[in-house]
Protein backbone atom coordinates (compact mmCIF):
# COMPACT_ATOMS: atom_id res chain seq x y z
CA UNK A 1 0.00 0.00 0.00
CA UNK A 2 1.51 3.28 -1.06
CA UNK A 3 1.85 6.22 1.29
CA UNK A 4 -0.25 8.50 -0.89
CA UNK A 5 -3.49 10.32 -0.20
CA UNK A 6 -6.35 9.00 -2.37
CA UNK A 7 -7.94 12.43 -2.75
CA UNK A 8 -5.12 14.96 -3.00
CA UNK A 9 -2.14 12.87 -4.10
CA UNK A 10 -0.03 14.06 -1.18
CA UNK A 11 2.91 11.64 -0.89
CA UNK A 12 6.21 11.05 0.88
CA UNK A 13 8.77 13.84 0.63
CA UNK A 14 12.49 13.52 1.23
CA UNK A 15 14.89 16.01 2.68
CA UNK A 16 17.58 16.65 5.24
CA UNK A 17 17.52 16.92 8.99
CA UNK A 18 20.02 19.69 9.70
CA UNK A 19 21.70 19.79 13.10
CA UNK A 20 23.08 22.81 14.90
CA UNK A 21 26.54 21.95 13.54
CA UNK A 22 25.04 21.89 10.02
CA UNK A 23 25.40 18.10 9.77
CA UNK A 24 22.86 16.78 7.26
CA UNK A 25 21.06 13.45 7.56
CA UNK A 26 18.67 12.22 4.88
CA UNK A 27 15.11 11.59 6.05
CA UNK A 28 11.59 10.92 4.79
CA UNK A 29 8.66 13.15 5.68
CA UNK A 30 5.51 11.01 5.70
CA UNK A 31 2.01 12.38 5.14
CA UNK A 32 -0.46 12.09 8.01
CA UNK A 33 -2.70 9.40 6.48
CA UNK A 34 -5.76 7.84 8.07
CA UNK A 35 -8.39 5.38 6.90
CA UNK A 36 -11.79 7.06 6.73
CA UNK A 37 -15.28 6.20 5.56
CA UNK A 38 -16.99 9.07 3.77
CA UNK A 39 -20.65 9.17 2.82
CA UNK A 40 -21.71 10.11 -0.69
CA UNK A 41 -25.05 11.92 -0.70
CA UNK A 42 -25.63 11.26 -4.40
CA UNK A 43 -24.77 7.54 -4.34
CA UNK A 44 -26.44 6.97 -0.95
CA UNK A 45 -23.56 4.79 0.27
CA UNK A 46 -20.33 4.79 2.21
CA UNK A 47 -16.92 4.92 0.53
CA UNK A 48 -13.60 4.03 2.18
CA UNK A 49 -10.49 6.08 1.44
CA UNK A 50 -6.99 6.50 2.83
CA UNK A 51 -6.61 10.26 3.05
CA UNK A 52 -4.38 12.87 4.63
CA UNK A 53 -5.92 14.76 7.52
CA UNK A 54 -5.50 18.02 5.58
CA UNK A 55 -7.54 16.49 2.73
CA UNK A 56 -10.24 15.47 5.17
CA UNK A 57 -10.50 19.08 6.32
CA UNK A 58 -10.72 20.17 2.66
CA UNK A 59 -13.56 17.72 2.02
CA UNK A 60 -15.52 19.17 4.92
CA UNK A 61 -14.74 22.73 3.80
CA UNK A 62 -16.01 22.13 0.26
CA UNK A 63 -19.27 20.66 1.49
CA UNK A 64 -18.79 16.91 1.44
CA UNK A 65 -17.33 14.16 -0.72
CA UNK A 66 -19.50 14.81 -3.77
CA UNK A 67 -18.58 18.50 -4.00
CA UNK A 68 -14.90 17.77 -3.37
CA UNK A 69 -14.67 15.14 -6.12
CA UNK A 70 -16.60 17.30 -8.59
CA UNK A 71 -14.07 20.10 -8.17
CA UNK A 72 -10.94 17.90 -7.89
CA UNK A 73 -8.54 17.36 -10.78
CA UNK A 74 -8.44 13.77 -12.08
CA UNK A 75 -4.64 13.75 -12.17
CA UNK A 76 -4.32 13.90 -8.39
CA UNK A 77 -7.09 11.40 -7.59
CA UNK A 78 -6.42 7.69 -7.14
CA UNK A 79 -8.03 5.16 -9.47
CA UNK A 80 -10.70 4.32 -6.90
CA UNK A 81 -11.52 7.98 -6.33
CA UNK A 82 -11.79 8.55 -10.09
CA UNK A 83 -14.25 5.67 -10.37
CA UNK A 84 -16.38 7.11 -7.56
CA UNK A 85 -16.25 10.53 -9.23
CA UNK A 86 -17.48 9.05 -12.52
CA UNK A 87 -20.33 7.27 -10.72
CA UNK A 88 -21.36 10.50 -8.99
CA UNK A 89 -21.27 12.55 -12.20
CA UNK A 90 -23.22 9.87 -14.09
CA UNK A 91 -25.91 9.70 -11.41
CA UNK A 92 -26.16 13.51 -11.24
CA UNK A 93 -26.52 13.71 -15.03
CA UNK A 94 -29.26 11.07 -14.98
CA UNK A 95 -31.11 12.90 -12.21
CA UNK A 96 -31.15 16.23 -14.05
From Swiss-Prot:
- Using the record for this protein, list the coiled-coil segments as residue ranges, or answer none: none
Concerning Pfam families, the annotation shows: Ribosomal_L28
Under the GO molecular function aspect, what terms does this record hold? structural constituent of ribosome
Its domain of life reads Bacteria
The cellular component terms of Gene Ontology attached to this UniProt record, alphabetical and capped at eight, are: cytosolic large ribosomal subunit
Please give a single GO biological process term from the UniProt record. Answer: translation
Membership in a protein family:
Belongs to the bacterial ribosomal protein bL28 family.
Task: Give the protein's recorded name.
Answer: Large ribosomal subunit protein bL28
Q: Which organism is it from?
A: Methylocella silvestris (strain DSM 15510 / CIP 108128 / LMG 27833 / NCIMB 13906 / BL2)
Amino acid sequence: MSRRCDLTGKAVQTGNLVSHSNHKTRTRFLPNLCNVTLISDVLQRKVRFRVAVAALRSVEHRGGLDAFLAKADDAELSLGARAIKREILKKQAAAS
